[in-house]
Swiss-Prot record:
Lineage: Eukaryota, Metazoa, Chordata, Craniata, Vertebrata
Summary of subunit composition and partner proteins: Homodimer.
Highest taxon, organism lineage: Eukaryota
Matches recorded under InterPro entries: MBLAC1, Metallo-B-lactamas, RibonucZ/Hydroxyglut_hydro
Protein name: Metallo-beta-lactamase domain-containing protein 1
Keywords: Cytoplasm, Hydrolase, Metal-binding, Nucleus, Zinc
Record comment regarding domains: Contains four of the five characteristic MBL-fold metal-binding motifs, with two waters completing metal coordination.
GO terms for MF: metal ion binding; RNA endonuclease activity
Amino acid sequence: MRTEPLCGASPLLVPGDPYSVVVLLQGYAEPEGVGDAVRADGSVTLVLPQTRGPASSHRESPRGSGGAEAALEEAARGPILVDTGGPWAREALLGALAGQGVAPGDVTLVVGTHGHSDHIGNLGLFPGAALLVSHDFCLPGGRYLPHGLGEGQPLRLGPGLEVWATPGHGGQRDVSVVVAGTALGTVVVAGDVFERDGDEDSWQALSEDPAAQERSRKRVLVVADVVVPGHGPPFRVLREASQPETEGGGNSQQEPVVGDEEPALH
């Protein structure tokens, strides 16, 4: 197995059915000045259902057992934002969304991969969206619902769309979003489980639980054809021809669509 950068400027579009993935803003982490100062911001990714459902019913709080699961699946019928970047990137985020024809009020679900300010600093732009931040899920208005997310117990949002517990970097409550069925195979939006492609020299120093994060990294690499890391361009996961294909993986050779070009859905 090896990895290689998926080249292209933001926004980078990977068409899919039933969900397409748009990397709106590529994260970065760059040394600044002397000492250990770093200027950084997290990647921001949009997951778009091919067919959008009505945007009203997800705002109502479901009753009874299975409420969180039903509410999550309902919220996933509209645009899903994975991380929001830091508050200093507010205008860049709004501009990137507008470039996709999405207003803040159109977003029905925001997933925060972990609780660091460079990843969830713009939650206030989306008061009408359901929020899944780390392991906390709430509906608009602050109604929190219990759910079964845990290591080895994913939350299903829709066909080929899941949230996984991927602990390590920020502690025990980090999550990743797994999108199967794209033109490039399975895309995993991994937050800071991966800082960037080729981060083997640095990720452990930034991890609250390196052992847990190592397990999370291995789990992601088993299924991913493309990884969207927290602070760098997306990268491909390339397997030897003799390796068995994993569920959702196809290692498609189709290239993503970059910039303002229209994706050709297949």
